[in-house]
Amino acid sequence: MTDNVLKLSRKNIKKLIPYQSARRIGGEHGNILLNANESPVSIFFKLKKKPFNRYPECQPSKLISSYAHYVNLSCNQILATRGADEGIELLIKAFCEPGKDAIIYCPPTYDMYRINATIAGVEIKEIPTIKNTWQLDLLNIKLNLSRVKLIYICNPNNPTGNIFFKKDLIFLLNITLGQALVVIDEAYIEFSPEESMTNYLKDYPNLVVLRTLSKAFALAGIRCGFTLAKKEIIQTLSKVISPYPISIPVSDIAIRSLEKDYVQLMKNRVLDSNNNRIWLINQLKNITCVETVFESNANYVLVKFSMFEKVFETLWNKGIILRNQNEKMNLKKCIRISMGTRSESLRLIKELKIFSKKNMCQGEMSEK
């Protein structure tokens, strides 16, 4: 009977491997979680007493106006969503015809662009970034624009941590004008705010920017994000969003987080994270089992290790949970490390030094 039920599912879903989120693949036993690019510290809000027997506004007006003020845009340019992930999905729903249109995504990058397109039955054109520099392969993107409706760019890119050249993003916007939307996922932009593309929304009707409160705002648990675009795009997305995407508690917490004092606290946390990243990178460069530390503009660092599997497993068993990137395109032997507190980073470095000393003494460090 179960087999008969499973036959009812769509063919592409039967073959689909779901997104392997940090919580989905385990590691909850760990006491140092450096695998999901979350804030290592939490902020707390006292919820207002409100009745919950009525549905919320589809787009809570106070939330929209608060975020509009934060990003210096008009309210009609903003759609509140369940994390930036919902924005990724809505764009495909609203703009791509299954079996006809395509998206471009540029691995190694965030997998949800590809997964959402697969679920929707939309073709995926994979244009890898240039190896080692991780910059966009503009020539191949230009040659593959046929039938493309959406181009997803994560900036800063996850998991590599690099920023894409602004001139390349502008070039992309120009060559796709009237043909495709360029979607810049700025989930980590608060860590490099000068690189944001929001100022270009007034110049390019084909630009869409995705944002979230999950990272710098330390609110991954409430799932609140935003899509920023021309009002016509926002109106189109509003046709396909669920009736009540933002719950009353989520809206209340998000509004509080966007108040002046809390925004300043967020900026202070970002400064601490960026300083900790600089410190961690310098420390990692002196660890024997580390081959390469890639520069980063976000709250994580990509590191290439010798004996990477043994490094990952050893730290895992000690309760330090990192993110294995070995299966990602061009990221062999790489592990992504989220920024933790300074004490967590000190513990990580201590364990890596112990590991290196032990394995160097055993003559195993030459294994590549």
From Swiss-Prot:
GO biological process: L-histidine biosynthetic process
Gene3D superfamilies: Aspartate Aminotransferase, domain 1, Type I PLP-dependent aspartate aminotransferase-like (Major domain)
Pathway where it operates: Amino-acid biosynthesis; L-histidine biosynthesis; L-histidine from 5-phospho-alpha-D-ribose 1-diphosphate: step 7/9
The UniProt record lists the keyword Amino-acid biosynthesis: yes
Cofactor(s) the protein requires to work: pyridoxal 5'-phosphate
Key word Transferase present: yes
Assigned EC number: 2.6.1.9
Reactions accelerated catalytically: L-histidinol phosphate + 2-oxoglutarate = 3-(imidazol-4-yl)-2-oxopropyl phosphate + L-glutamate
Group of enzyme by EC: transferase
SUPFAM superfamilies noted in UniProt: PLP-dependent transferases
Matches recorded under InterPro entries: Aminotrans_II_pyridoxalP_BS, Aminotransferase_I/II_large, HisP_aminotrans, PyrdxlP-dep_Trfase, PyrdxlP-dep_Trfase_major, PyrdxlP-dep_Trfase_small
Alphabetized UniProt keyword annotations: Amino-acid biosynthesis, Aminotransferase, Histidine biosynthesis, Pyridoxal phosphate, Transferase
PANTHER family: HISTIDINOL-PHOSPHATE AMINOTRANSFERASE, HISTIDINOL-PHOSPHATE AMINOTRANSFERASE-RELATED
Protein family (similarity comment): Belongs to the class-II pyridoxal-phosphate-dependent aminotransferase family. Histidinol-phosphate aminotransferase subfamily.
Name of the protein described by the UniProt record: Histidinol-phosphate aminotransferase
Species of provenance: Buchnera aphidicola subsp. Acyrthosiphon pisum (strain Tuc7)
